[in-house]
Amino acid sequence: MIVDNAVIMAAGTSSRFAPLSYEKPKALIKVKEEVLIERQIKQLQASGIKEIYIVTGYMAEQFDYLKEKYGVCLIHNPFYLSRNNNSSIWVARNVIKNTYICSADNYFSINPFEKEVNDAYYAGVFTDGYTEEWCMQEDADGNIISVHVGGEKSWYMLGHTFWSERFSNKFLRILERQYDFPETADKLWEQIFIEHLDVLKMKIKKYAPSDIYEFDTLDELREFDASYKSNSRSLILKNVANRLQVFEADIMEIKTIKGNDTAAIGFEFSALGNRYSYYYESKEIMSMK
């Protein structure tokens, strides 16, 4: 089937990617000198997918330049703080047909997109060792028949998905029925998919581990792009390093601090064997000894 378009989800706050995601959306961070979402847009366009929608939410205005630069369309998700990513699917529902559903913060070392696709699929990477990711099992026809968190010697969910129009119609009908249920708000769209594997048929599209990357934290990004060790591109971390008289590379093991409303209010970090906390509003650095 011919791919109609692509929807790139870029609405979330990515609070685990502290403090860089406090300063700008994670999708707009450069990896190996290329803006994450721009790389993905260019890969889609190179594959013949010209109709591209970006679902925005957090710091939405920072994505505006993409309209003129790449001719993409922006769809705003006003529910990005109160709901999980099922709300991004919901606000884009009118354009989802034979559609790539992508996450803005994935880095593809190869171009995984094609203009013609045979079946609905979820990209997967194989692991021999144990992982906390969502592990998939398939039947003899290659259809996903179960998904569970954590496993070994398994294909796990990582990267983009392709929805056939048939899959899209079925999923969107289910989402419409369940959208206003209180328990739906916190669900990933993947959880809704998993709850209906009997009617939502999707295969595993298998990739090598070196094909798809996802960076949940600055420490993970530094493993892939070593330039971030000496230059974090973060004014906050530069200020912290200056005040503590350490190098940026000495600041590591960063963990987000959340307030009562689950919004990020700061982060913990280690530097030269000591543990500290930093709070965005007060700019205070506190020793955690």
Which residue stretches match the model-derived regions?
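Catalytic-core segments of class I nucleotidyltransferases/pyrophosphorylases
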Residues: N143-I212, D219-N239
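Conserved core of the sugar-phosphate nucleotidyltransferase
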Residues: S109-T184, K255-K289
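Conserved beta-loop-beta/alpha segment of the NTase-like Rossmann-fold superfamily
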Residues: D64-C135, A140
